[in-house]
Amino acid sequence: GPFALDKEYPNWDDEGEYTPIFKTIPQIDHVSVWDFYPDADATNMEQAQYIIQRHKMSRTELRALKRRPYFRESLIEDAIEQGENYTKKYWEDDLIDYNTENEIDRFEVLEYWGMIDVEFLEDQAIEIPKELKKYDELQVNVWCCNGKLLRVVLNPFKPARIPYMASPYELNPYSFF
């Protein structure tokens, strides 16, 4: 989906001192079909109650999440202390020719977009806006790794929606893909 990203542009002043310029720019990315898990009962994104995206991250990439909004620094460090937890799936050997990553240990980080009980949000000390208190479920974005909830936030999009688009090669009225 589209997100804002702060990008650093190299810049030097008249004295030769490095003074980078930071601009917020839109970012869009693709997700491999192997890392995208939509609602199993949905046949398209409009019907999906949730999606899960799997991220394979290095220790450095996981630590970089601490600089992004609403990520819980101490829980990220706890997840790192537990060690890399990614295990290669059976079908990934078939994709080895397309592998752009080095064969080093990784963390499996799961990103969830979808509905969740308000009770759970209150247990996580998430402040529920007054106008949303009447609902039993709300749309959220949750990141987890090694059993740690790295990020739990209400869906920031207005209206709340899952920020993914899926384009199947052929439409099948009985299946997502």
Task: Name each region found by the language model.
Residues G1-F177:
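Extended alpha-helical, oligomerization-prone segments that build pores/tubes and scaffolds
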